């Protein structure tokens, strides 16, 4: 499994449409369109829409934003939600043979929390009708947002998610590691504990800690001891500081600011600057109209000297309980 900063052929997305997930749908669509505008210049966009009417409306929105439509491929598919990172395939590469393949894991809507979203488990097979790639199916439950790799053999994940009985009940840590070795080509595992408050995925790593190069990890840190995320994130930070890469080298762990409390009267939302997407030439970062937005952009730019870091307001997108990394799945170039 390549690291996210390795070259992409395309990025896969699914246009938001459900007002249950996105009560501020118009604002969420605007953030989504802004994301496409920024990313399409350096990697092709493969975009799912529900029907011809949605396609026409979406194309019009992108045209207004001066998106080069020849770089957008629109696919009409039946899908429930936009979280491609979790229900989409995880692409893998055989570098000596220059061959691309996909691994198709079982998506059970984060522990069967949302029965209406279970149909998104079929998206990878639908994609492969046109891609026609070799497809490998481990037969176990896993979401792309629960793992983070450096492309050299190391993988970071959380016990809260991968060992959760609502995913693969009865499966041991060693058994899960064996599946990850066999299907993703990793050999070294860094297990963190738990995720952030408001995260319905049971502790996905892409809201906590992200590799930015083979030996450097950005890790969210909450200095406010009264915040429920403080203790959790401090423990994760300490675990990363004590960890090594696949060759036994210590990792450089860089603290990443957190937005703080983002939400409404119904509760806290899983807002995290760590949910950025690493494109071919840009890193797209979710912003939340909080005092730490600027500091987060500065921190992320410092670890990506060869890419432009772009912030996009995702305050209304996060009502769907995710942002840019959650909604994307990169297709590696071979």
Language-model features: where?
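The feature marks the mature, well-folded catalytic cores of soluble enzymes
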Residues: 1-334
């Amino acid at each position: 499994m390549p690291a996210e900063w390795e070259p992409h052929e395309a990025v896969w997305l699914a246009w938001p449409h459900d007002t249950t997930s996105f009560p501020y749908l118009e604002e969420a669509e605007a953030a989504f369109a802004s994301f496409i505008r920024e990313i399409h210049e350096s990697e092709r966009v493969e975009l799912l829409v529900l029907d011809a009417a949605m396609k026409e409306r979406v194309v019009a929105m992108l045209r207004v934003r001066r998106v080069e439509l020849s770089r957008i491929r629109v696919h009409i598919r039946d899908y429930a939600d936009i979280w491609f990172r979790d229900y989409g395939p995880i692409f893998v590469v055989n570098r000596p043979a220059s061959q691309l393949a996909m691994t198709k894991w079982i998506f059970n809507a984060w522990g069967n929390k949302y029965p209406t979203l279970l149909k998104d488990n079929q998206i990878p097979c639908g994609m492969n009708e046109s891609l026609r790639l070799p497809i490998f199916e481990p037969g176990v439950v896993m979401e792309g947002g629960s793992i983070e790799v450096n492309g050299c053999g190391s993988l970071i994940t959380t016990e809260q998610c991968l060992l959760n009985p609502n995913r693969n009940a009865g499966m041991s840590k060693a058994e899960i590691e064996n599946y990850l070795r066999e299907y993703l080509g990793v050999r070294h595992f860094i297990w963190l504990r738990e995720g952030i408050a408001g995260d319905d995925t049971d502790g996905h790593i892409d809201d906590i800690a992200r590799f930015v190069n083979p030996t450097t990890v950005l890790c969210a840190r909450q200095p406010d001891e009264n915040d429920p995320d403080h203790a959790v994130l401090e423990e994760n930070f300490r675990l990363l500081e004590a960890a090594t890469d696949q060759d036994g080298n210590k990792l450089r762990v860089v603290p990443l600011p957190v937005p703080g409390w983002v939400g409404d009267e119904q509760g806290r939302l899983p807002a995290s600057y760590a949910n950025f997407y690493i494109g071919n030439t840009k890193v797209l970062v979710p912003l939340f109209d909080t005092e730490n937005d600027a500091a987060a952009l500065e921190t992320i730019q410092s670890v990506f000297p060869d890419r432009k870091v772009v912030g996009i307001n995702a305050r209304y997108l996060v009502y769907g309980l995710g942002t840019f990394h959650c909604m994307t799945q990169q297709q590696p170039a071979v």
